[in-house]
Swiss-Prot record, chains A, B:
The gene is INV1. Keywords: Glycoprotein, Glycosidase, Hydrolase, Signal. Its EC number is 3.2.1.26. This is Invertase. One of its GO terms (cellular component) is fungal-type vacuole. It comes from Kluyveromyces lactis (strain ATCC 8585 / CBS 2359 / DSM 70799 / NBRC 1267 / NRRL Y-1140 / WM37). The lineage of its organism: Eukaryota, Fungi, Dikarya, Ascomycota, Saccharomycotina.
Length: 609, 609
C-alpha cells in the first residue's frame, strides 16, 4: 500500500520562541519534578526489544542457544520488586524461538543473601561435562553452567550455578566461589570454549573478567570451569572512562567486499556453518531473513585498497574482538562501549592496531554480550542494554525500566572512514523475524523526489503501531550550498495522538553529519533531566560514492536504532512520548531548494499484537 | 561586598510542559529559521576571550612571545569580509601585554590568489638566522618566521613567510613551497626548536604536520626551515574521527604532589625559568598571578602511589605531549581534541601508554596550539578555538563569529581517575590578569550552607557585566539517597534582563556526575539547531577524599570554561542569550534535603570596559 500526500505548509518567518516556563517559579517546578505520577510516564513499552513486564533490568547475561529445543535464552540483571536497581539483584530469564518475540520466565536464580547481588556473567554449555555437574540424564546440548559475580559485603567473587532442566532452574555450586582475588571490583565473567588452532589441542575454557577500577580485563583459563589460571591481562587500553565493565572476547568473521543482498536483517538460520575464510553471503531463503523484495537494499561495500593490517585478516578470515564497556566518563555522557580488533592465541589478546573504536555512537548501548553456541558457527550475535547509567533509574516508564537492544549479527569489515582511507570496523546487522513482522503490516514508499523548501511530503501510517522499519537513500548536490545556512534534509517522526511530540532525524550538508533530536516531547523527564542528551549526531560517510548516503532504522515505541552506511556506524537511542502516542507519520522536508534528492524512502510498519 | 538573599519560592508540582511550538506549522518555521535577523542574534561578545570585531575566525595560528617588546602575539584563520568561513582565508593578528586584553591588528598576511587559503600554521623565532631571512637590523628576539599551509586548487603545501617588523607585516619566501607531497590534505605545520639531550648537539627545527585523511602526523626535521627531511610518522593512534588536524608536539613539565597555592590562574611571568626536573611551585607575587587572598583554593593533589609509567616522568621531570585535533566524528558530535603522553627523541614520538585521552570534554575546544618562546621556559601555554565545526558558521553572533578559549598553562600531573587508580593527565590552568580584573569588580560568597528542597539561595550581582569567575566546593552525604530520585545540586546562572534565559550547572549524587544545560535560551539557534548539544556532562571525581568536590569556572558573556578537580578535567562550552542579557544572579538549589553542603561558593564579578 502506498500513501503519498503533499501538503502545502504555511512558512512562518523565523521567530523567537518564548519559553514561558523558564522563569523562577518554573525553575522551582523542575526541582520538584522527580515524582512518577502516571501522567508524566510513557507507557510505550517496546514490542520487539525485550523488556520485563515489571521491575528493573540492566545488563544482558548468560546468552545461549539451546540446539535441542531450538530456543534462544537470555538472562539479565533483574530486580523484580520495583522499577529501579536494588538488592537482592537476581538473574531474570526469557526465551525466544525467533529472537523477536520473547517469553518471560521470571527469576532464574539469585544470591543467597538479601543484601547481595547476583551480578553479571555468562553461560556455557558443558557438552563434555568437564565440570562434573552432569550425568547422562542431561542432554549434552543442555548442560548449562552459569558463571556469575557475587557482590556481597564489599567483595566480588566468581561463582558457578548449573541447570539440569535446560536453563530454567539452577543449583549453586557448593564450593563457590571459584575465583576470589580479594577485590571489591572484580566482575562480569564471560566464558567461552577455546579449541586452539592445533588439531591435537584438547581445548579449554577461557574467561575474561573485569578488574573494573584498575581498567584491567583479566584472562583466565580452566579445564573444568572450577579451577582457573590467570594467563594475562589486557589493561588500560583505549578510552578508560571511570571503570571497565562487561568485557568479552569473541572470534568474528572478516567479510571483504561483500554484497549484503539480504542486509540489514541477516539470515541467522542458514543450514550448516559458513566457512570462516570464504566470502560470506547471506541466504535470502530463510524464514527470518530480510525480505529483499519488500525493501531492497542492494548496497555494495567499496573495492578500495585494503590497509596493511587487513592482509592478516584476509588470510585467516576472522579477527578476535575484545569488547569493553566503560562507565561513567563517556564524552557523550555516562556509559559507553568500545572494542579492539586483534588476535588471541589462547592466553593473550593483542590488538592489531592502536585505534580506539566506539561501538554504537548513541547514548543507549551498554554491556554488550554475545551468545554462546550460535547454530551457524560463524554468526556472532549479541545484545546490549539499551540505556545509560546516567539516567537509567529515572527514565519515565512504569512498571518496568529498561529494554534490551535488538540482537545484532557482527562481522569485521573495512569501510571508508573518509574518502582516502579505509579502516576495519565491527559491522552490525539487526536480526529479527522480518518476514513475519512485515506480513500483516503496511508499507509506504517515496521515490525519486527532489526536495525544495516550499513544500513537504507526508507518509501517514494506517493504524499506527509505533513499530516500523525505514530505509532512506538520498543524494546530495553540494554545489552552491552556503556554509552559513543550515542545509538540512529532515524527517519528522510525528506522534499520531499528539503531534507536539516528534523525533527529528536528518542530515546537514555543510557538516556532512546526521542528527537525531529526541527532545520534542511533553514528558517532564525529557524536558528537564540534564543527562538526557536530546541532540545526537554521527558523521555519515557515503556508502559507495561521494554524493549518495543511506540510513536504515528500526523504531519500536520508545527506542530507535539507526544503521548508517549498511551497518558500519550505528546509533541506538531511547525516546519518550506520552502514553499511547505512537509515531503516526513521517514528514519529509528540506529548508533549502534542490540540494536533496530522495532516491527512496521505504517504510514497513510492523503488525504487532 | 557580600550579598546573600534567601527567597522562598513557590514549589509547583511536576507539570507537563506543553510546547505549543511543536506542531506542523511550527515545524515549518524551523525549516525557515536560518536567517540572521538581528532580533535572533546574540551580541554578547566575550570580553576576556579573544574575538575579532568583525568577520570569521577559526584556528589559532602562529602563537609567539616577543621578549624584546614583552608582547604576546596571536594569529588566526580569518575571513574579514563576512561572519562565515570564506576565501581568500587570511591570518588575522592580535597583540596583548597580559593575555587578557587583546589589541586587534587586522590581516597579517594572506594567500596570493583570491580562491586560495592561508591555512593554519605556526611561527618561530629564528634567533640564529638559520633561514637567512634576516640581518643584524632585526633584533634576534623578533626574527619571526611563519610556517603555514597554502590551500589552492586542490593542493596543500607548506609555505614560509617572514617579518622584519616584529610580526606586523610579512614577506612570502620566494622559493615557496618548502614542502609539497602532492596531497590535497597536508596541513597545519607546527614547528619548534629541538636542542637535543646531548650538550654538543647543534639542534634543529622539528615540524609536525597532518596528512589529515590518512590520520598521520608527519614529523620532519630541518636545519634552516627551508629544507625538510621526513623522520617518522605518528599514525592511526587513539580516536580517529574523520580527519586529523592541527597536530602539535610539546615538552610539558611533570608536576607531582604539588600544592597549587596559586591555581587556577597560574603565574606566567615569574622571573627566571623553573628547572624542569624540580617540583614546580607557582609564585604568588606576580602581577598577573591568581590572587590567593580573594578566592583561596588550597587544593592538594593526592599522595596516592604512582603507577609504573610515571616513574620515568619523575626521573626526567617532563613528558612530551602530542596534541591531535579530529573533525568530525566525535561521539559528542563534530570536532574534538585528544592528546598522547610520551617521549620524543628528536625524530620519533612514542606514547608511554595505550590510553586515549580527550582534552576538554566540552563541545567547543578545538585546534589547540601552544606558544613558541614563553618567557618562563617550562610554561606550556596554549589557546584553542572555542567552537565546533558542526555549527561554527551558524552560531548567532554578529558581526563576528567565534572566539578563542582562554590561554591555559598545561602541566602533566597524575590524578585519581577513580578511587583505586591514578592516571596521568594534561592539567589545565586558566591564565588571565586576575588581579586587574578583580580590582574594580564585586565579590559574593556563600559558606557552610546545608541545602534543602524547600528554600534556595540567590547571589545577585550588582551591575551585571556578564564576566565573572566562581569557585564552588561542596560535600555530598551519600547516605540514604535513592537511585530513582534525581538528586541534584543545581546552580542556575540567570539572565539579568530576561530570566527565561539561564545556564543550569550542577551535580547529581547517584551518577556522581556534573552537568551543564545550555538549552534555556530564547535564541532560535539554541532552540532549533540539532547540532547545538544543549546538555553536557562530565564525571567529576573528588579532589582529595570521597565526599568533597570542587569546580572552578569562568563565565564570559557567551562562553563558560569549567575546571574540575583543580584542572584535571575541563569542559568549555559556548552559550547564547539574547543581546544584552548578562548573567545577573546565581540561584543555588537542591531538589533533596540534607544531601549537599556548600562548603564555599565564591564569586568575583570582573569589571570590564
Amino acid at each position: 500500500m502506498l500513501k503519498l500526500l503533499s501538503l502545502m505548509v504555511p512558512l512562518a518567518s523565523a521567530a523567537v520562541i518564548h519559553r514561558r516556563d523558564a522563569n523562577i517559579s518554573a525553575i522551582a517546578s523542575e526541582w520538584n519534578s522527580t515524582s512518577n505520577s502516571s501522567s508524566s510516564l510513557s507507557l510505550n513499552r517496546p514490542a520487539v526489544h525485550y523488556s520485563p513486564e515489571e521491575g528493573w533490568m540492566n545488563d544482558p547475561n548468560g546468552l545461549w542457544y539451546d540446539a535441542k529445543e531450538e530456543d534462544w535464552h537470555i538472562y539479565y540483571q533483574y530486580y523484580p520488586d520495583a522499577p529501579h536497581w536494588g538488592l537482592p539483584l537476581t538473574w531474570g530469564h526469557a526465551v525466544s524461538k525467533d529472537l523477536t518475540v520473547w517469553d518471560e520466565q521470571g527469576v532464574a536464580f539469585g544470591p543467597e543473601f538479601e543484601t547481595a547481588g547476583a551480578f553479571s556473567g555468562s553461560m556455557v554449555i558443558d557438552y563434555n561435562n568437564t565440570s562434573g555437574f552432569f550425568n547422562s540424564s542431561t542432554d549434552p546440548r543442555q548442560r548449562v553452567v552459569a558463571i556469575w559475580t557475587l557482590d556481597y559485603s564489599g567483595s566480588e567473587t566468581q561463582q558457578l550455578s548449573y541447570s539440569h532442566d535446560g536453563g530454567y532452574t539452577f543449583t549453586e555450586y557448593s564450593d563457590n566461589p571459584v575465583l576470589d582475588i580479594d577485590s571489591d571490583a572484580f566482575r562480569d565473567p564471560k566464558v567461552f570454549w577455546y579449541q586452539g588452532e592445533d588439531s591435537e589441542s584438547e581445548g579449554n575454557w577461557v574467561m575474561t573478567v573485569a578488574e573494573a577500577d584498575r581498567f584491567s580485563v583479566l584472562i583466565y583459563s580452566s579445564p573444568d570451569l572450577k579451577n582457573w589460571t590467570l594467563e594475562s591481562n589486557f589493561s588500560r587500553e583505549g578510552y578508560l572512562g571511570y571503570n571497565y565493565e562487561c568485557p568479552g572476547l569473541v572470534k568474528v568473521p572478516y567479510v571483504k567486499n561483500t554484497t549484503y543482498a539480504s542486509a540489514p536483517g541477516s539470515n541467522i538460520t542458514s543450514s550448516g556453518p559458513l566457512h570462516p575464510n570464504s566470502t560470506v553471503s547471506f541466504s535470502n531463503s530463510s524464514s527470518i531473513a530480510w525480505n529483499a523484495s519488500s525493501v531492497p537494499l542492494n548496497i555494495t561495500l567499496s573495492n578500495s585498497t585494503l590497509v596493511d593490517e587487513t592482509s592478516q585478516l584476509e588470510e585467516v578470515g576472522y579477527a578476535w574482538v575484545m569488547i569493553v564497556s566503560f562507565n561513567p566518563g563517556s564524552i557523550l555522557g555516562g556509559s559507553g562501549t568500545e572494542y579492539f580488533i586483534g588476535d588471541f592465541n589462547g592466553t593473550h589478546f593483542e590488538p592489531l592496531d592502536k585505534q580506539t573504536r566506539f561501538l554504537d555512537l548513541g547514548k543507549d548501548y551498554y554491556a554488550l554480550q554475545t551468545f554462546f553456541n550460535t547454530p551457524n558457527e560463524v554468526d556472532v550475535l549479541g545484545i546490549a542494554w539499551a540505556s545509560n547509567w546516567q539516567y537509567a533509574n529515572q527514565v519515565p516508564t512504569d512498571p518496568w525500566r529498561s529494554s534490551m537492544s535488538l540482537v545484532r549479527n557482527f562481522t569485521i569489515t573495512e569501510y571508508n572512514i573518509n574518502s582516502n582511507t579505509t579502516a576495519l570496523v565491527l559491522n552490525s546487522q539487526p536480526v529479527l523475524d522480518f518476514t513475519s513482522l512485515r506480513k500483516n503490516g503496511t508499507s509506504y514508499t517515496l521515490e525519486n523526489l527532489t526536495l525544495n523548501s516550499s513544500s513537504h511530503e507526508v507518509l501517514e501510517f494506517e493504524d499506527p503501531t509505533g513499530v516500523f522499519e525505514f530505509s532512506l537513500e538520498y543524494s546530495v548536490n553540494f554545489t552552491g550550498i552556503h556554509n552559513w545556512v543550515f542545509t538540512d534534509l529532515s524527517l519528522y517522526f510525528q506522534g499520531d495522538k499528539d503531534s507536539d511530540e516528534y523525533l527529528r532525524l536528518g542530515y546537514e550538508a555543510n557538516s556532512k553529519q546526521f542528527f537525531l533530536d529526541r527532545g520534542h516531547s511533553n514528558i517532564p523527564f525529557v524536558q528537564e533531566n540534564p543527562f538526557f542528551t536530546q541532540r545526537l549526531s554521527v558523521s555519515n560517510p557515503p556508502s559507495s560514492n561521494s554524493s549518495t548516503f543511506d540510513v536504515y532504522g528500526i523504531v519500536d515505541r520508545n527506542i530507535i536504532e539507526l544503521y548508517f552506511n549498511n551497518g558500519t556506524v550505528t546509533s541506538t537511542n531511547t525516546f519518550f512520548f506520552s502514553t499511547g502516542n505512537n509515531i503516526g507519520s513521517i514528514i519529509v522536508k528540506s529548508g533549502v531548494d534542490d540540494v536533496y534528492e530522495i532516491e527512496s524512502l521505504k517504510v514497513n510498519q510492523f503488525y504487532v499484537d
